[in-house]
Amino acid sequence: MSNSLSNTVPPDLSAQPENPGEWPKSDFNCATIKALIDAFQRWLGEAFDSGIAAERLIEARTEFIDQLLQRLWVEYGFGSINDIALVAVGGYGRGELHPLSDIDLLILSRKKLPDEQAQKVGERLALLWDIKLEVGHSVRTLEECLLEGLSDLSVATNLIESRLLIGDVALFLELQKHIFSDGFWPSEKFFAAKVEEQNDRHQRYHGTSYNLEPDVKSSPGGLRDIHTLQWIARRHFGATSLDEMVGFGFLTEAERNELNECLHQLWRIRFALHLELNRYDNRLLFDRQFSVARRLRYEGESNQPIEHMMKDFFRVTRRVSELNQMLIQLFEEAILALTEDEKPRPIDDDFQLRGTLIDLRDDTLFIREPQAILRMFYTMVRNSSITGIYSTTVRHLRHARRHLTQPLCYIPEARTLFLSMLRHQGGLSRGLLPMHRHSVLWAYMPQWSHIVGQMQFDLFHAYTVDEHTIRVLLKLESFAKEETRSRHPLWLELWPRLTHPELILIAALFHDIAKGAGGDHSILGAQDVLKFAELHGLNCAQTQLVAWLVRHQLLMSVTAQRRDIQDPEVIKQFAEEVQTENRLHYLVCLTVADICATNENLWNSWKQSLLRELYFATEKQLRRGMQNTPDMRERVRHHQLQALALLRMENINEQALHQIWNRCRANYFVRHTPNQLAWHARNLLKHDLSKPMILLSSHATRGGTEIFIWSPDRPYLFAAVSAELDRRNLSVHDAQIFTTRDGMAMDTFIVLEPDGSPLSADRTQMIRVGLEQTLSQRSWQPPAPRRQAAKLRHFSVPTEVNFLPTHTDRKSFLELIALDQPGLLARVGQVFADLGISLHGARITTIGERVEDLFIIATADRRALNNELQQEVQQRLTEALNPNDKG
């Protein structure tokens, strides 16, 4: 696995700045200290930019602060006091001071300090804050240190890393003797606590470093994972460096070199990040990634510097994670010792069990027979009691991986084993997932290497391409489990209908395999999967299905979210693309898994309702036949009769009902369900129809809260309502805009809270009052523009306005792609009203920082827009959505 920084420019080492960090022998006042600190911080940036290694600069800052604190200690008279010492702890104790790292100090005394000395310590610490040093400190006696350390793991860890700066050497050595004694956090207890702490930390980051805004220090595979190894080794073995761990036999020299390389690469990124910030933080947030990448000399156009940097970062964290898990196991064996149950038990001629971990019986097997690597993972799939790979076997696997002469998929037995894994229940979670974690998926199929660590610079994708793909596979596997029913009932019913589930898994493996390769990744991925299918012996029908799924992976998602799926013609066109119910079953399962695995917040009841609606409508169309589409009048009658049946149960006035319905146009009945029609009618019959009425559904309708508005129609009504909903922080996902024959607006909005849930009950009255005030206003006043969300300011989405082909001359379909921004719908509505254009429907889709909306519009006389008006709309919308000042 290559980890060279191939997209960086080497620095010019010919003119490195001179270190200003020499403390004056006299004139040691606050202003002098602050000036020298500022000069030193500037030098750190200049030195880093000139090519001096981060580890040298970290060492230089540590030494610089050491000298300052030692000088201050003497200057203020502490040097002559016995039984007191100044001790560096935490990261400072390790000697790991980045530009913005906290300076953690312990003022250690044998007995409680007299009030006068305690006051003097407080005054001197205040001076450090005055000169803008981020100092964390504690003042403790030896006894207090030990008591605090025994009760608090973080205090104990800080003490284990302690380093004497100046003061009573004997006192410090006494502290060291106590904290490394068996009575102070015995090795077994410390090891177990640190492993639990690491597991908890990993869980906070969803178990992966592959979140696209990772924490360089705390994400899985980050610096903390290396620190954890160092802490455990320090406590148990007394090892103060990776070199000493080699001496104890717990690291090979190659592993030591690899960990050092990873450590220095992570230091380099963290150092550059700190130079770009004013306040301590270790998160590579989107708005920082470009400047950090440039500082690290990554090159390329547009977002390429970011993608190259993050790819290097993610590949480093992958290596750290694997080494961390392997060494944790080795520590466990050494510290906790094997129990009788953990003695090896044979599985077959090749493998044995140590506890619940699979282990090699012959250390040379993977080198002699590379296909045995796949045999091991298939054994893990077939035996659900195996929870992982034994540490020494991981070491042999890593060694064999580096000595492979060809991809594993070129070995016939390996191909057979790989397909067997895909066909086996649990084959993904127990086989492909660990293969991915140990870089064997990369070794098996060469295409996988291109997407490992591949990020996309947007707010839509939460994970790298490889991590997303693995999550798609795991989501698909979950459709076979009964516990998934509450969240995905339909897909659970469909899964058993897939005649060859392994085919959808192959399609999932390849659906994003060509991301970042240039060109349409769906087309390129379909070409790649054809080669895979041929190599693995799939028959013609199976090959065609997986290639079709990869090629059309976005078809259902785009149709459901960005097309008018209540239009029979749209359903017919979609059904013509799908062709068979079998394809439909595969496609809907892949689509749902893809959405769920893209971003944890992306899947909601609204998207589920859209996909269900499209699925059932397409299923009906396929069973009916392509030549038969439902007649509009037939659909109107059907919906009216079903709604009437519901209303008759309540003894409504049918004559009054028909008077209301006679005012409505046919589209109103087609685009609402019978339940919606009955709900509207039930309330309209009790209402003075000359006055506005606002209804908010108490139960989710089509996955969201339905807001129904009855009001005299007027220009800018849609813009005004949209502005009010935006002001209330509601997301509009669908709008149906109707006008009765006598000029009353009957508008329906499906809205969700920002977290994707229906409107919370405690907000209903507030929303209703706000809308009532909006309807009472006679004229339209555009709202004052709100500031754009901070995250969005770092993204750019060119506004695109496209008119889609249509089968009718009575309406136009406008597709809008733009940067998400406050008040977008209101601005769109204002443009339509300015141009005298009627809005009949809207489908609103927000994908991260990007909106992809569909608007159904017509002229005032209910005709499609001509070319001239289309051009005017394009120009006005582009101007409205690209203001010079984004706030």
From Swiss-Prot:
Residue ranges of every copy of the ACT domain listed in the record: 706-786, 813-887
What's known about how it's activated or inhibited?
Uridylyltransferase (UTase) activity is inhibited by glutamine, while glutamine activates uridylyl-removing (UR) activity.
Please list where the region (Disordered) is annotated.
1-24
Q: Annotated region Uridylyl-removing: where? A: 347-705
Family matches, as Gene3D superfamilies: Hypothetical protein af1432
SUPFAM superfamilies found in the cross-reference section: ACT-like (SSF55021), HD-domain/PDEase-like (SSF109604), Nucleotidyltransferase (SSF81301), Nucleotidyltransferase substrate binding subunit/domain (SSF81593), Poly A polymerase C-terminal region-like (SSF81891)
Locate the region Uridylyltransferase: 1-346
The EC number(s) this enzyme carries: 2.7.7.59, 3.1.4.-
Q: Does the keyword Nucleotidyltransferase apply?
A: yes
**Per its UniProt record, what SMART domains does this chain match?**
HDc
Q: Name one GO molecular function term.
A: [protein-PII] uridylyltransferase activity
Q: Name one GO biological process term.
A: nitrogen fixation
What is this enzyme's catalytic activity, as reactions? [protein-PII]-L-tyrosine + UTP = [protein-PII]-uridylyl-L-tyrosine + diphosphate; [protein-PII]-uridylyl-L-tyrosine + H2O = [protein-PII]-L-tyrosine + UMP + H(+)
Please state what is observed when this gene is inactivated.
Answer: Cells lacking this gene are unable to uridylylate PII and are altered in adenylation/deadenylation of glutamine synthetase.
Q: Does the keyword Nucleotidyltransferase apply?
A: yes
Q: HD domain spans which residues?
A: 465-587
Q: Which cofactor does it need?
A: Mg(2+)
Q: Which keywords describe this protein according to UniProt? A: Hydrolase, Magnesium, Multifunctional enzyme, Nitrogen fixation, Nucleotidyltransferase, Repeat, Transferase
Q: What does the similarity note say? A: Belongs to the GlnD family.
The record's comment about this protein's domains reads: Has four distinct domains: an N-terminal nucleotidyltransferase (NT) domain responsible for UTase activity, a central HD domain that encodes UR activity, and two C-terminal ACT domains that seem to have a role in glutamine sensing.
According to its UniProt entry, what is the function of this protein? Modifies, by uridylylation and deuridylylation, the PII regulatory proteins (GlnB and homologs), in response to the nitrogen status of the cell that GlnD senses through the glutamine level. Under low glutamine levels, catalyzes the conversion of the PII proteins and UTP to PII-UMP and PPi, while under higher glutamine levels, GlnD hydrolyzes PII-UMP to PII and UMP (deuridylylation). Thus, controls uridylylation state and activity of the PII proteins, and plays an important role in the regulation of nitrogen fixation and metabolism.
**Identification of the protein by name:** Bifunctional uridylyltransferase/uridylyl-removing enzyme
Identify the gene encoding this protein: glnD
